[in-house]
Amino acid sequence: MKRKLVDFCIISLPQHNERRDKLKNEMAKYDIECRVSHAIDGRKLLAEKYFSLFKIRSSKMFGRGFLTPSELGCFLSHKKALTEFLASGRKWLVVLEDDVLPKENVKYLDEMINSFCSSSVYILGGQDGLKSFSRVIMGRKSICGVRKVILGTHRWLYRTCCYCVDIKGAERILRLMEENSFFCDDWSYIVRNAKLDNVFYGQYFSHPLNLNSSSIEAERLFIAEK
């Protein structure tokens, strides 16, 4: 596939120069050029903005009905990246958060995307260290380097650190984001309410096991302790 049809986008807070440069350099080794979409730091939102958007209708986090500041920032950052993609004229979007690292098979990803299905979401890895991933059931047959997630077990997939959608899928997700807020990695809610056709999974990127630098994780731990 001609790369001009694929938008490889790194979501990164402006101050995280080192992290995004490392990822850009790693991707460049496989002849993949990435653009940067500067993330929105939810901790710096005005109170009026935060309280107008923090309530959610569906929750993966033990019934919690609101987003923390960093979770809302994540939501708005992905919404921004999707909006930028739809204005770009490209056909496919690969979203990467700046803490992932590519596996060697990422060199085939561009070619594989050419055979991906429309109106679906492709989770490209990033489940490292998550016990929930053992509950995900996938088809045995690997097509285009990915396997279909079946029996509704995509509810056990977490993180938005690496995924791929086409124009139709992006439009549907963005439309849902315009309607209300939700956890960015609530894939069950997204697939159901954005009316996406399928979820596929492939191992193209890894996520660090150490989450000490994650503001989202810090806020979740703070709430859990209360």
Spans of model-derived segments:
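An acidic/histidine-cluster motif and surrounding catalytic segment
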Residues: 1-96, 100-226
